[in-house]
UniProtKB/Swiss-Prot annotation:
Domain tr-type G stretches: 8-286
Lineage: Bacteria, Bacillati, Chloroflexota, Chloroflexia, Chloroflexales
Protein known as: Elongation factor G
Protein biosynthesis is among the record's keywords: yes
Function: Catalyzes the GTP-dependent ribosomal translocation step during translation elongation. During this step, the ribosome changes from the pre-translocational (PRE) to the post-translocational (POST) state as the newly formed A-site-bound peptidyl-tRNA and P-site-bound deacylated tRNA move to the P and E sites, respectively. Catalyzes the coordinated movement of the two tRNA molecules, the mRNA and conformational changes in the ribosome.
Keywords annotated in UniProt: Cytoplasm, Elongation factor, GTP-binding, Nucleotide-binding, Protein biosynthesis
InterPro entries given in the database record: EF-G-like_DII (IPR053905), EFG_II (IPR041095), EFG_III (IPR009022), EFG_III/V (IPR035647), EFG_IV (IPR047872), EFG_V (IPR035649), EFG_V-like (IPR000640), G_TR_CS (IPR031157)
Chief localization: cytoplasm
GO molecular function: GTP binding; GTPase activity; translation elongation factor activity
Binding site for GTP: 17-24, 85-89, 139-142
SUPFAM superfamilies attached to this UniProt entry: EF-G C-terminal domain-like (SSF54980), P-loop containing nucleoside triphosphate hydrolases (SSF52540), Ribosomal protein S5 domain 2-like (SSF54211), Translation proteins (SSF50447)
Organism listed in the record: Chloroflexus aggregans (strain MD-66 / DSM 9485)
Keyword flag Secreted: no
Length: 702
C-alpha cells in the first residue's frame, strides 16, 4: 500500500505547557476542527478525548501523553498532524521528556493571565535540550486579567526567546472577539462561541495604528534572520506575504524566532489559525537533521566509534525509537514508536538493537486518543503503536535486522520521593507485585524495590501526586487494595575527601578458594556528576576479564549505601593496582573485594548525607505575602526573589523536600485557598549535621 500522505505534509508536534494553561482543551478543539470528534469534550466536565484515564478525568489534569493523528487542509492541500498531548504537572516530567525526544515541533500554551509559570520554564528548557522548534499560543484571552503584551514580554525576559508576534488580539477579557493577522492585515472576528460563524473583516480603525507598528516590527525581525531578506528590506522593497512566511518558517525551524498567536480555546477562538500556523511554520520530518546512532555495543562519543546516519526516507533501512509503553485495557501492552527512516509492514520481524533481541510486529495501530485503527504499514516520519511487544521498553531502538543501529536513548531524572506500601490482604500480595512491575514498565521514573532489612515494598517517584496516581491506578486497573506509609525523602550519601583504599577478599575452604585484591583511589566529584569509573591497571596485575566485575561490585555497593543505606553519588573511582591468583580468582571474588573497598572508603572519606532541594514558586495575594515568606523560613527555605504579577506577589524559593510534605494543604488553609504553588526538584545539597545525625541514628535503630 503506497504512502497516503507525502512526508513534507506530515507534522509531528507536541502540545506542552504549565498545568492549567489549557493544553488539553486546545488539543480537544484541534481534534474537533480536524473532524476527529463530532462532539467537543470539556476537561471540566471530565469528557475530554485525550484524557482517557479515569484519574485524569477526575483530576482534570493530563497524566499520560496520548498520541493522536488529525488531518488538516490548508489552501486545498491535505496535511497530517500527529499530536502528542503531554502533562504539565511537574511530577510527570518524564512524559514531557519522552514526547519531546520524538517530536519535530511543539506548541507551547501559555495562560494569558499568569503568563510564563515555573513549569513553562522547565518545559521550555526540556524543549531546548532536544532542539525542538516551537510556536506559542497565548490562551485564555477572555479571562479577567489577561494581557497579551505582558505574556509576550515574559516570553522574552523569562525564557530568553525572540517572540515574533504574528497576531494581535481584538478586545480583551469579556470583549475578546477575534484576532488581527499581521501578514494579511485582516481581522478575523468570531461571532459565536462554537467557532462556526467566523468572518474576515477590515481591521477596526482604532486598532490600525497599533497593528501597523506591530507589522513593521515583525517584518524587521524576519528580515534580520535571513541575508537575502535583509538586502531586500534595506533596499526598501516591499516583502510579499509569501516571502515573509517562508522567512519566518526558516527562522522558526532554525530556532531563531518563535511565532506567537493568541486565542481562547474554551470559547473556540483562535484554534483554526493555530492549526494553520502548525502547518506553515513547524517542521516536517524532512526539515529536521538526519538521525545518528552507533553499532550495537558501542557508545556515542567514545573514541573510534563509527557514527551511522539515517536520512528521513522510506528507502532507508527501517529505524525507529520506542518512546512509550502503555498497558491498554483492551489489547494488552502497547509500545508507541516513532519511525525515523524506512518503512515496515505488520507481521515483519525487527531487531531490538538496544537489547539484542528480535521482536515481531504482529499488529500495528494508529492511535486516536483512546480509539485505534489497524494499519498494514508504517512509513518514515510517522508515529504508530505495536501490540504486545515481548522485549521492547521505553528508549529502545527497533530496526532492520540486516542494518543494526542504536539511537541515543531517552535519559530520565532519578526519583526523589519514596513510600512504603503493603497489600491489605494475602490475595492482594501477588496482584500487587504484578501491578507494580507493569506500572514500572510504563514509567521509567517510577521504581519499585524491596527493603532488604525490613522486607517492605518501597515505591519511588517524582513527587507526592505521582505516587498518589500510581496507588490510584493500582486500585482501579488492577483491583489491588494497599496501605500506604508516609512519603519519605530519598537522601543520598557522598564523600568529601579523597581516599586511597586497599581491600582483599580471600577465602580458603577445602577445594577451590576465592581470591580478589584491589587498590582503588576514591575522589569526590562535583554535585550531580554521578559515578565515574577509571581503569588505570597496567601490566595486567588484574586480568582485564575481571575489570567489569570490579566496576559492577562498586556500582552495586553504591546502591545500598554505607552510613544510612542511601545510594552513594558523585564519586570517581580509579582502579590502579591489585593482584590475582591463577586458580582461586573469579569475577565473584573481585566483585566482593570492590564492594568491601567502597564501603571502607566511604566510612573513611568524611561522608555526608545529601538532601533533595525543591524549587518552589508560590503566587499569593499581597495581604498574605508575610505569611508565605514566614512559612518558607520555618521550612528551612531560602528565598530567591519576590516579584509582582498583576495584583499578586510571586515568591520564588529553594526548600528541602523533607519540609515540603503537605505544603499545598497548609498553604491553602493559611491563605483562605487564594494562593497557589508549584514545585520541582532542583538539586541535592548537604544536610545540616544535626539533622544528618538524627537520620543516621534512626536508620541504624531500624
Amino acid at each position: 500500500m503506497p504512502r497516503q500522505i507525502e512526508l513534507d505534509k506530515v507534522r509531528n508536534i507536541g502540545i506542552i505547557a504549565h498545568i492549567d494553561a489549557g493544553k488539553t482543551t486546545t488539543t480537544e478543539r484541534i481534534l474537533f476542527y480536524t473532524g476527529r470528534t463530532y462532539k467537543i469534550g470539556e476537561v471540566h466536565e471530565g469528557t475530554a478525548t485525550m484524557d482517557w484515564m479515569p484519574q485524569e478525568q477526575e483530576r482534570g489534569i493530563t497524566i499520560t501523553a496520548a498520541a493522536t493523528t488529525a488531518p488538516w487542509r490548508l489552501n486545498g492541500v491535505e496535511y497530517r498532524i500527529n499530536i502528542i498531548d503531554t502533562p504539565g504537572h511537574v511530577d510527570f516530567t518524564v512524559e514531557v521528556e519522552r514526547s519531546l525526544r520524538v517530536l519535530d515541533g511543539g506548541i507551547v500554551v501559555f495562560d494569558g493571565v499568569a503568563g510564563v509559570e515555573p513549569q513553562s520554564e522547565t518545559v521550555w528548557r526540556q524543549a531546548d535540550k532536544y532542539n525542538v522548534p516551537r510556536i506559542c499560543f497565548v490562551n485564555k484571552m477572555d479571562r479577567v486579567g489577561a494581557s497579551f503584551e505582558r505574556c509576550v514580554q515574559m516570553i522574552k525576559d523569562r525564557l530568553g526567546a525572540k517572540p515574533a508576534v504574528v497576531q494581535l488580539p481584538i478586545g480583551v477579557e469579556d470583549t475578546f472577539r477575534g484576532t488581527i493577522d499581521l501578514f494579511t492585515m485582516k481581522a478575523t472576528i468570531y461571532y459565536d462561541d462554537l467557532g462556526k460563524d467566523i468572518r474576515e473583516e477590515e481591521i477596526p480603525a482604532e486598532l490600525r495604528p497599533a497593528a501597523e507598528k506591530a507589522r513593521n516590527e515583525l517584518i524587521e525581525m524576519i528580515a534580520e534572520t535571513d541575508d537575502e531578506l535583509t538586502l531586500l528590506y534595506l533596499e526598501g522593497q516591499e516583502l510579499t506575504v509569501e516571502e515573509l512566511k517562508r522567512g519566518l518558517r526558516k527562522a522558526t525551524i532554525e530556532r531563531k524566532l518563535v511565532p506567537v498567536l493568541c486565542g481562547a480555546a474554551l470559547r473556540n477562538k483562535g484554534v483554526q489559525k493555530l492549526l494553520d500556523a502548525v502547518v506553515e511554520y513547524l517542521p516536517s520530518p524532512l526539515d529536521r537533521p538526519a538521525i545518528t546512532g552507533t553499532l550495537p555495543g558501542q557508545v556515542m562519543g567514545d573514541e573510534g566509534v563509527e557514527v551511522i546516519t539515517r536520512r528521513v526516507s522510506d528507502d532507508e533501512p527501517f529505524t525507529a525509537l520506542v518512546f512509550k509503553i502503555v498497558a491498554d485495557p483492551y489489547v494488552g501492552k502497547l509500545a508507541y514508536f516513532r519511525v525515523y527512516a524506512g518503512k515496515i509492514t505488520k507481521g515483519s520481524y525487527v531487531l531490538n538493537s538496544t537489547r539484542g533481541q528480535r521482536e515481531r510486529l504482529g499488529r500495528l495501530l494508529r492511535m486516536h486518543a483512546n480509539h485505534r485503527e489497524d494499519i498494514d504499514e508504517v512509513y518514515a516520519g510517522e508515529i504508530a503503536a505495536m501490540v504486545g511487544p515481548k522485549n521492547s521498553y521505553t528508549g529502545d531502538t527497533i530496526c532492520d535486522p540486516d542494518h543494526p543501529i542504536v539511537l541515543e536513548s531517552i535519559r530520565f531524572p532519578e526519583p526523589v520521593i519514596e513510600m512504603a506500601i503493603e497489600p491489605k490482604t494475602k490475595a492482594d500480595q501477588d496482584k500487587m507485585s504484578i501491578a507494580l512491575s507493569r506500572l514500572a514498565e510504563e514509567d521509567p521514573t517510577f521504581r519499585v524495590y524491596t527493603d532488604q532489612e525490613t522486607g517492605q515494598t518501597i515505591i519511588k517517584g517524582m513527587g507526592e501526586l505521582h505516587l498518589e496516581v500510581i496507588v490510584d491506578r493500582m486500585r482501579r486497573e488492577y483491583k489491588v487494595e494497599a496501605n500506604q506509609g508516609k512519603p519519605q525523602v530519598s537522601y543520598r550519601e557522598t564523600i568529601t575527601v579523597p581516599v586511597d583504599q586497599e581491600s582483599r577478599f580471600v577465602r580458603q575452604t577445602g577445594g577451590k578458594g576465592q581470591y580478589g585484591h584491589v587498590k582503588i583511589k576514591f575522589e569526590p566529584l562535583p554535585p550531580g556528576k554521578g559515578f565515574e569509573f577509571v581503569n588505570a591497571i597496567v601490566g595486567g596485575v588484574i586480568p582485564k576479564e575481571y575489570i567489569p566485575a570490579v566496576e559492577q561490585g562498586l556500582r552495586e555497593a553504591m546502591q545500598t549505601g554505607v552510613i544510612a543505606g542511601y545510594p552513594v553519588v558523585d564519586l570517581k573511582a580509579t582502579l590502579y593496582d591489585g593482584s590475582y591468583h591463577e586458580v582461586d580468582s573469579s569475577e565473584m571474588a573481585f566483585k566482593i573485594a570492590a564492594s568491601m573497598c567502597l564501603k571502607e572508603a566511604v566510612r573513611r572519606g568524611k561522608p555526608q548525607l545529601l538532601e533533595p532541594i525543591m524549587k518552589v514558586e508560590t503566587v499569593t495575594p499581597e495581604e498574605f505575602l508575610g505569611t508565605v515568606i514566614g512559612d518558607f523560613n520555618s521550612r528551612r527555605g531560602r528565598i530567591e526573589g519576590i516579584e509582582a504579577r498583576g495584583n499578586a506577589q510571586v515568591v520564588r524559593a529553594f526548600v528541602p523536600l523533607a519540609n515540603m510534605f503537605g505544603y499545598m494543604t497548609d498553604l491553602r488553609s493559611a491563605t483562605q485557598g487564594r494562593a497557589t504553588a508549584s514545585m520541582e526538584f532542583d538539586h541535592y545539597e548537604p544536610l545540616p549535621e544535626a539533622l544528618a545525625k538524627e537520620i543516621i541514628e534512626k536508620r541504624s535503630a531500624n
